[in-house]
Amino acid sequence: MQKTLSTLKDKINNALVVDRENYIYRCHRSIFTDPQLFEFEMKHIFEGNWVFLAHESQIPQPGDYYTLTLGRQPVIITRDKKNELHALINSCAHRGAMLCRRKTGNKNSFTCPFHGWTFSNNGKLLKAKDESTGAYPETFKHEGSHDLQKLPRFQSYRGFLFGSLKADVQPLEAYLGETCKIIDLIVDQAPEGLEVLKGSSSYVYEGNWKLGAENGADGYHVSVVHWNYASTMSRRNYEAEGTHTVDANGWSKSLGGGYGFDNGHMLLWTRALNPEVRPVYAHRERLQAEFGERRADQMVNETRNLCLYPNVYLMDQFSTQIRVIRPIAVDKTEVTIWCFAPKGESDQARALRIRQYEDFFNVSGMGTPDDLEEFSSCQRGYLGENLPWSDLSRGALRWVDGADEHAQHAGFSPRLSGVKSEDEALYIAHHHHWQTLMLAAIEQEQQRYDQSITQRVEVA
């Protein structure tokens, strides 16, 4: 154990090179391929801190439930008859069978298919099968001893639900930090609130989860990987009612940039070249009156990809999307995507939003398949151990520590600013946070190991 921890610590310490004097910025490709690092990530990142779960609109009515996987653990989110939300481990308190085996539905109680124990949708054990004749001890069901296990931390920010399997984490708003301002920019576009539209797409790619996390903030690849999308849009017959889309050239030919925030969060933004095709454009006067010229301009004329570490992107660009990243193995990742929209928007705006979403984001769209091909190609390429480093230095001569001019104008306070959307500065902050979390995890495991050795000596 001691040797394993020491080896992992060396790997993590050497995973990122930030040499400002010589402008060398790179990460070691083993962070995408090492199974031991992956196990630590699952335990200490995905099961040890805040992780995005769902949006409140996915559990809208009393009795509704929604199931998901948090790290490696099955979770169910319910809304009880008092309209309160609960996040519970989706595992029977008796022998561990999954209680709820559908993705969504509406039930006020759950009966375990294995032995028939029944639980309220707030987690309370209502009855065990044959409880009166089962010769259970007096302590059975005492003070909730056999209720379902609630997540230690479960909280909403502006309708977005987050949970943690560890109680000792910082307050959610402190964890989100500066990104709260960007979430506000998205939510405040909708006077009646946001809703996730019915239907989702899920796909699995053969690559590490960090490939997907990097990609959503990668403005450099757009004009290369997604040239087919840009070319198709430029040739579409709009006079024949073809769907109008945000100009993909905005990622390279317009103003834009990227920010690395505390806690590993990232933002990629651009100035839209043709904002009039976005559904929000029709509401610019209302937004100006309600929020002022500066914030309204950000909402209407800028696109944004917001990564909330470690597992979700909130995208407000070609269309609007929630993209959830779920690691399965060191070289296998599941992604699930939804379109979200303002409640009560017009049929015309809703149809446009969905068509724009289908064009690029959908599994059958013109963006997603291209990205997945590159993910699997990178994962295979990372096995070339004779070339162990990935370069992250694009834009290094113009990166800004802290806030650049745009961030100052927007009221953001990032750790690092890339002043072009193709710059890779935000990855430095992103991977540095990974490194910080993993080193802290090593210290935790070392303390546990030392304590166990001490206890053995005391017993002996």
Task: State what each model feature region is.
Residues 1-14, 451-460:
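Basic/polar N-terminal segments that are highly enriched at the extreme N-terminus
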Residues 9-29:
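Short, contiguous pre-domain boundary segments
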Residues 31, 35-46, 51-70:
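Glycine/alanine-rich phosphate-binding loops at beta-alpha junctions
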Residues 46-50, 97, 221:
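Generic structural signal for secondary-structure transition and capping sites
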Residues 47-60, 133-137, 303-309:
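Short Pro/Gly-enriched beta-strand edge/turn motifs at strand-loop
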Residues 58-181:
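Rieske [2Fe-2S] iron-sulfur-binding domain
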Residues 84, 152-460:
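C-terminal catalytic domain of Rieske-type non-heme iron oxygenases
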